[in-house]
Amino acid sequence: MKKIKLATLFLAFTTLLSACGGTSSAAQASDPTDHPSESAIMFTDMVDRKITLDEPATRVIALSAADCEIIYALGAEDVLVGRGEFCDWPAEVLELPAVASGRETNLEQILSLQPDVVLMADMDQSEEQVAQLENAGITVVVSDADDVDGVFQSITNTGAMLGKDSEAAALVSSMQNTFASIKENTNDSEKTVYFEVSPLQYGLWAAGADTFMNEIAEMMGLTNIFADVSGWCEVSEEQVIERAPDFIVTISMYFGDGPTPEEEILSRTGWNNIPAVQNNKILNLANNELSRPGPRLADGAKTLYDFISAS
């Protein structure tokens, strides 16, 4: 039970953090050369910092889980020399040295891995930490995707950084095609959905507006029952019961001990009149596909679409 509790709280914590801006946004990028060569790689990162690289990065530390996934999806995993402590997919990424981020960042550890680029989310470091990295000659690239288009931009920037422009374009195109197909095949609907990101045992939290889940729900013509609240929000059982969703999506993890997250939801007192519970329309997406701004966001959307369409 301790494992379940820790994993669930960790999931809720990291999910909440992904919606919060950090303090590195105003940090300045490493000064580009006054006269960059014709072969230099130049792009603007997600917080409008001008990035110039003489050549594609060959030693990268990716601090966010989404950035790790993007690098793997581009077939460039060999450039990774370290990962953020919360990077967990694909499984082989766990073999890389883990680097703490945020307040617990160990700059000496980062420097010891000798990266030429550190790729981080906007929340990962302070301006002072970014400045220290850049003063050590390390290029810092910031990703800050908060919607689907932002994910596309993050993939494009990472492709540029790695000399994988064509692979990045192909990945973005594939994701765009998935989302376009979902939109084209979606009929007008009055159905509603509730996204549960933390279970009852540890306090109910839901995805509201300005989240990937809400954006994807809108693609499918679904109404998020907590679209009136921005970001990730703590909610009550009474609110969920009153709003009576037609579908419930949970991202709670299960370790094989006790009822599954779906079974636990079905057994909650007073929830038996909720349409999603009455009709057993509960989907578990505990693999971060819908909560992580990476390539698998399209896979999560397709899984949700198939689930809704089969209902």
Regions found by a protein language model. Give the residues of each.
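Structured C-terminal subdomain patch of bacterial secreted/periplasmic proteins
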Residues: 152-153, 160, 169, 173, ...
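Short helix-initiation/N-cap motifs at beta->coil->alpha
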Residues: 46-48, 97-108, 229-237
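Extracytoplasmic ligand-binding site segments that recognize negatively charged/polar headgroups
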Residues: 126-129, 144-157, 190-212, 256-259
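Alpha-helical, coiled-coil/dimerization segments enriched in small aliphatic residues
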Residues: 86-89, 205-232
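A ligand-binding cleft/hinge motif common to bilobed small-molecule-binding domains
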Residues: 124-135, 242, 247-266
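Hydrophobic core
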Residues: 11, 15-16
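A short, structured surface patch at a secondary-structure boundary
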Residues: 59-113, 117-123
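Bacterial Sec-exported substrate-binding components of ABC uptake systems
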Residues: 2-7, 18-66, 165-194, 247, ...
